[in-house]
UniProtKB/Swiss-Prot annotation:
Catalytic reaction equation(s): L-tyrosyl-[protein] + ATP = O-phospho-L-tyrosyl-[protein] + ADP + H(+)
Assigned EC number: 2.7.10.2
Gene (UniProt): YES1
Stated name of the protein: Tyrosine-protein kinase Yes
SH3 domain sequence ranges: 87-148
Binding site for ATP: 279-287, 301
Coiled coil: none
Residue numbers of Phosphotyrosine PTMs: 28, 332, 341, 422, 533
Domain Protein kinase: 273-526
Organism, as annotated: Canis lupus familiaris
UniProt GO cellular component terms: anchoring junction; cell junction; centrosome; cytoplasm; cytosol; plasma membrane
Domain called SH2: residue spans: 154-251
Length: 539
């Protein structure tokens, strides 16, 4: 967790599932039960959760500031499962192997079948293994109803076009590898996504709409209709029949992160955590790689005494844990007595800032950097929909995983910091260079001030981690920005991308784009804005 040091004081961030559209409730209202969203997914788990996704910390060389913030409203997703799944009458099948983490969990193998005894707990269901007869808790995102489409290995549920392309284009995948997902545009329809190759585009992904007939059948072209989706897929593995290539193998996936560490593992005892490898430190604490309960690798943020009030932290953490999106680092558990510990998903690649400056990010070209920006915009568009605010969006607070997957960290806590050097907003610990002028000068933090910060983050990406406003101290940045100064286009950066940055830096917050627009712009960047892009020396 770290801080920004100004010059004045000499001191130096595989499967996919989106969260369904929420139902709004009061930001500080009673905490509702929230189940893992389904059946908008395959039951394969939450999205793009590579098991080795990285976690960095607060500071170290990257100067990470600790956290984000909140606005006045928040939304949650109600349980999509009917109450009728109680009584042990519904059969579910395991999609992955799972090793028990506590004495109340069940270990199981993929393909094992269960009777669901009680699903009212949301993320962890009480179940009975049909094979062993044992009862225990299982993670609900590791199972799907037996004999359903969701139980098929090729079904990836509610996944966007861009995320399907990211998965299929991963290194090592071959032509003909495929997946099936929900259609983004047509309710009740599906999309078949196939990796292809041609001389003009090289490796690419083709998408085909699978439509449903009134009588329940499925088709891509009307001349070939099938009773079930399974029969359509099987036929397409044997005959291209108008597709770019016949289907070869299912796109590989890695089992997802569970929602939380275990049943009722939210406020946990300090003794259940073992701190093993220190990953970084900053003004407000440290971050460690560690183990929970002797079984589960996690990241642990330890806060210095007095950083924030435990009661305020716990209240905010209850809200933060409800924010679930594949581009946000999930909050697993807390130690709520000082010194406060925050337990999150462990991510191995480090912060985006360190990755760009010292890791493999140094060698990335513009397409990869724009895709990373699009992923961050995807996560921020979710925060935007949920009426939340980050407050500290920058490369130091973005975490990088395998295959360049990005997740947003440290959202929801910046407004809780008690340190005078931070709360003054112009103190040495405050990230002035990333903060919109109305927020830095008057404390007006909104999602539009996050948009400003995203524009600054784009300069970090295109300059491989250079500090914004090079050669300028914090006070000078504030004065110059108020007078209308904006950073020039980084060397090698296309002007069309710099134009997006300038939109993010509009003086009037209402004139700045939404994250939904930014995500769309970046995802289609090389087809709409820069179709003639050619790699340069740096970008």
């Amino acid at each position: 967790m770290g801080c920004i040091k100004s010059k004045e004081d000499k001191g130096p961030a595989i499967k996919y599932r989106n969260t369904p559209e929420p139902v709004s409730v009061s930001h500080y209202g009673a905490e509702p039960t929230q189940a893992t969203p389904w059946p908008s997914s395959s039951g394969w788990g939450t999205a793009f959760n590579f098991s080795s996704l990285s976690m960095t910390g607060f500071g170290g060389s990257s100067g990470v500031t600790p956290f984000g913030g909140a606005s006045s409203s928040f939304s949650v997703v109600p349980s999509p499962y009917p109450a009728g799944l109680t009584g042990g009458v519904t059969i579910f099948v395991a999609l992955y192997d799972y090793e028990a983490r506590t004495t109340e969990d069940l270990s199981f193998k993929g393909g094992e079948r269960f009777q669901i005894i009680n699903n009212t707990e949301g993320d962890w269901w009480e179940a009975r293994s049909i094979a062993t007869g044992k009862n225990g808790y299982i993670p609900s995102n590791y199972v799907a109803p037996a004999d359903s489409i969701a139980a098929e290995e090729w079904y990836f549920g509610k996944m966007g076009r861009k995320d399907a392309e990211r998965l299929l284009l991963n290194p090592g995948n071959q032509r003909g590898i495929f997946l099936v997902r929900e259609s983004e545009t047509t309710k009740g329809a599906y999309s078949l996504s196939i990796r292809d190759w041609d001389e003009i585009r090289g490796d690419n992904v083709k998408h085909y709409k699978i439509r449903k007939l009134d009588n329940g059948g499925y088709y891509i072209t009307t001349r070939a209709q099938f009773d079930t989706l399974q029969k359509l897929v099987k036929h397409s593995t044997e005959h291209a029949d108008g597709l770019c290539h016949k289907l070869t193998t299912v796109c590989p996936t890695v089992k997802p992160q569970t929602q939380g560490l275990a049943k009722d593992a939210w406020e946990i005892p300090r003794e259940s955590l073992r701190l093993e490898v220190k990953l970084g430190q900053g003004c407000f604490g440290e971050v460690w790689m560690g183990t929970w309960n002797g079984t589960t690798k996690v990241a642990i943020k330890t806060l210095k005494l007095g950083t924030m009030m435990p009661e305020a932290f716990l209240q905010e953490a209850q809200i933060m844990k409800k924010l679930r999106h594949d581009k946000l680092v999930p909050l697993y558990a807390v130690v709520s007595e000082e010194p406060i510990y925050i337990v999150t998903e462990f991510m191995s690649k480090g912060s985006l800032l360190d990755f760009l400056k010292e890791g493999d990010g140094k060698y990335l070209k513009l397409p990869q950097l724009v895709d990373m920006a699009a992923q961050i915009a995807d996560g921020m568009a979710y925060i935007e929909r949920m009426n939340y605010i980050h407050r500290d969006l920058r490369a130091a607070n973005i975490l990088v995983g395998e295959n360049l997957v990005c997740k947003i960290a440290d959202f929801g806590l910046a407004r809780l910091i008690e340190d005078n050097e931070y709360t003054a907003r112009q103190g040495a610990k405050f990230p002035i260079k990333w903060t919109a002028p109305e927020a830095a000068l008057y404390g007006r933090f909104t999602i539009k001030s996050d948009v400003w910060s995203f524009g600054i983050l784009q300069t970090e990406l295109t300059t491989k981690g250079r500090v914004p406003y090079p050669g300028m101290v914090n006070r000078e940045v504030l004065e110059q920005v108020e007078r209308g100064y904006r950073m020039p286009c980084p060397q090698g950066c296309p002007e069309s991308l710099h134009e997006l940055m300038n939109l993010c830096w509009k003086k009037d917050p209402d004139e700045r784009p939404t994250f939904e627009y930014i995500q769309s712009f970046l995802e289609d960047y090389f087809t709409a804005a820069e179709p003639q892009y050619q790699p340069g020396e740096n970008l």
